[in-house]
Amino acid sequence: MTMEFSNPPDAEIRAILARPSTVAVVGCSDSPARDSLRIAKLLKSRGFRVIPVNPQLEAGALRDVLGEDCYPDLASIPGPVEIVDVFRRPEFVPDIVEDAIAKGARVLWCQLGVIHLEAARRANQAGMTVVMDRCPAIEYARLF
């Protein structure tokens, strides 16, 4: 049985992007050449508090760039996270969803090419808004 998935309507995506909040960028790289860091910097420039999540980076690796420590996982982040932006391969998404649910996140945003229907269903069942296979930079350009 295949699950149908539709991203939220444009008005809802616009509302997510128009209201700066705390976003955890899972899979954030410290390389300026990587999309994950470029998107993290864009979100920061739009007023979001951006928390990098990458177990392979030192805590202070992105402090100068994003103003926040890097954490190995969502559970390690002190305080609430509203949006979880995923820059990991699809097979990692189910575990990220479980961590996001435990953290109380309200939005799961999976980047271009990151699609996992069962994880999206689980996130929706937990009350999360799910955006998949979309990039915030492209959505900003398209909706604002």
Predicted regions and their residues:
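Rossmann-fold NAD(P)-binding glycine/threonine-rich loop
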Residues: L112-Y140
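A short helix->loop->beta-strand "cap" motif at the edges of active sites that frequently abuts
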Residues: R46-F48, K103-L108, A126-M128
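Glycine-rich, highly charged phosphate/nucleotide-binding loops
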Residues: M3-P9, L62-G79, D85-P94
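NAD(P)-binding Rossmann-fold cofactor-contacting core
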Residues: A33-R34, K41-R63
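Short, charged, surface-exposed secondary-structure boundary motifs
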Residues: A61-D64, V81-E82, E118-R121, E139-F144
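Short N-terminal or domain-adjacent regulatory/targeting segments
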Residues: M1-R19
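Rossmann-fold NAD(P) dinucleotide-binding segment
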Residues: F92-Q111
